[in-house]
Amino acid sequence: MTIQVAFIQIIQALSPIHGDREAASIAHILMEHITGLGKMDRIVYKDRELTEDQADRFQKGLDALLRNEPVQYVTGTGWFYGMELQVTPDVLIPRPETEELAEWIIEDVKKAGKQPGNQETGLEMQGRILDTGKRIVTGLHPSILDIGTGSGAIPLAIKKNLPSAAVSAIDISAGALEVAKANAKKLSLDVNFSLVDVLDVNATAALPIFDIIVSNPPYICEQERAGMQEQVLDYEPNIALFVPDHDPLRFYRRIGELAQEKLAPGGGLYFEINEAYGAETVKLLEEQGYVEVVLKQDLFGKDRMVKAKKL
């Protein structure tokens, strides 16, 4: 079987399920994974025969796709903010909307670092902190915590683009943390990962103070299951997706409470949110005492992100 024949077979098999365009996109991803060749090279070498191993991986991959398994789980990889990450069924597949959340933080920190008065050295800042007994958010060397990190996509994107930041991340899933640590090692990025249940007050008590806390927590209500894609329900970890219908903001409430204890004065709290609860999330944070609460839409025009400032 040649590269071109294999590519066409994938499209023909998947088009009735996903449509021609999505089927072609999936075919490109799988064939690059199998052959190690980019799109242009696969065109040049379209008549090259697959090796026995490649043909076996092709058939296993196609069988998995026909079971509606996401191509990212089939290949074991997904892309986020220009980084190729390992993904397994222990973690959610990274999504473009979450890239926007990471970018918001990166841009804000870079802007803060350019403000007048923020050009002091790390030693000068450390001395000023010791003198006053308070943390000062300057944007130079922020300490950042990601809650519910999954594959580590958010903290790794932040660390890659803000190398002087001290970045930590927590998750309730040991399996997810294994994936996140593997991604950090592969990318040679220094992020501190810990097994912590954010809903457990005792477990979070030992966390230090941070300049920024970010989270993309579970936010899909159980009643929304009916409108979701089957492959998400069948393959992605439900623990990272769903919240009870009677308490859709449970994680935002808890993380907001935690951030009042663990955020430095002037620190920032960033969330990805359920588009149906934008106004409610803003109201919750304002009631918790946060100021400068901003609701932001994603590229699709949906309420998707919120940031707030601790006094």
Report residues per predicted region.
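Active-site beta-alpha loop architecture of Rossmann-like, nucleotide-cofactor-dependent enzymes
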Residues: 72, 220-223, 276
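Conserved SAM/SAH cofactor-binding pocket of Class I
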Residues: 100-133, 137-227, 254
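Conserved Class I SAM-dependent methyltransferase catalytic core
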Residues: 245-309
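Conserved AdoMet
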Residues: 31-108
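Mobile active-site "lid"/loop adjacent to the S-adenosyl-L-methionine
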Residues: 219-250
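Short loop/edge segments at beta-strand edges and connector loops
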Residues: 75, 195-196, 273, 297
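Residue-level signal for inorganic ion chemistry
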Residues: 30, 68, 98, 154, ...
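Non-catalytic accessory regions of SAM-dependent methyltransferases
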Residues: 1-43, 47-50
